[in-house]
Amino acid sequence: MSRPRKSKIEFSRPLLVDRVPRKGSHEVFAAEPQECLELAKRFSLPKLHSVKAHLIATPYRGGGLKVTGSVDADIEQISVISLELFASRMHCDVERYFLPPKILVDAVEDDADPIENGEIDLGELVAETIALELDAYPRKPGETYDDPALDSDDNETKPPSPFAKILKTD
């Protein structure tokens, strides 16, 4: 039921809300190579090798949809410690709610997204999920940051503690 569409969004897979059956709709799709390149630019990644989504859209509350499932992505990142490139695999669980604008205004749930023009974009949902799961300070597995200044016992390199007088016991 989702179909590729040319738009400003790097990874678009629109789904018409009124076409989703009562028992739900299974949506399995992957990003094309060009879409991976565009998403890598969007996320400032050296490379995004693949993105695959396994989603289930089910009717929810008066014309809305609940989307659950998982997203997998193979990416390359740059370590903030060694500045070396490394590959990693992301697996993200998805649970998102979409409501018509009229119901969304009256809804108590703050985490629901609006349904626009009778459709939702599963590709954008996947892109947002990846963006939220990306590590802001990626490190290669097993890599640690060792700063000798932090481990030094030299009092000249450490600023005086505001609690130094309290901690003194005479």
Residue spans for each PLM region:
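A positional/architectural concept
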Residues: 1-72
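Charge-rich, low-complexity linker and terminal segments
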Residues: 1-22, 26, 50, 97-170
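A structural signal for short, well-ordered beta-strand segments
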Residues: 29, 53-55, 69-71, 90-96, ...
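Residues that cap or initiate secondary-structure elements
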Residues: 35, 61-63, 79, 102, ...
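Short, intrinsically disordered, mixed-charge
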Residues: 41-45, 80-87, 132
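Helix-adjacent hinge/juxtasegments
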Residues: 64-105
